[in-house]
Amino acid sequence: MTSPITVVTGANSGIGRATAIHLAVNGHRVFGTVRAVAKAEKLLATAAEQGVEIELAELDVADDASVERGFADILERAGRVDHLVNNAGVGGNGVVEECSSEQFLDVMNIG
């Protein structure tokens, strides 16, 4: 049986990084999307510490052309995508519990 192929957007930090690592540890082939592959050292180091590999794909969810290029790259390498974790967002200031509804929507509404 082949491993499920999962794409995690915004995998370079926070919840995205933790999700990508968790899925890889649990047998998924994970493609972590990041805006700049050159800045993904922490993601790759954390994966290596856990004994797993995260494959990177450069993708900015706020740029349609970047999304098309990123998914074309993933599909070329993997042939399919079984799961998508749509995690990417812009950073907010403070903790979620203290954000207004408007601030929360600003974090989630990219582009």
Where are these regions (language model features)?
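Conserved glycine-rich cofactor-binding loop
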Residues: N12-S13
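Substrate-binding pocket helix/loop in short-chain dehydrogenase/reductase
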Residues: V95-V96, S100-L105
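Conserved glycine-rich Rossmann-like NAD(P)H-binding loop of the short-chain dehydrogenase/reductase
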Residues: N26-K42
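The beta1-alpha1 cofactor-binding region of Rossmann-like NAD(H)/NADP(H)-dependent oxidoreductases
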Residues: L59-R69, S101
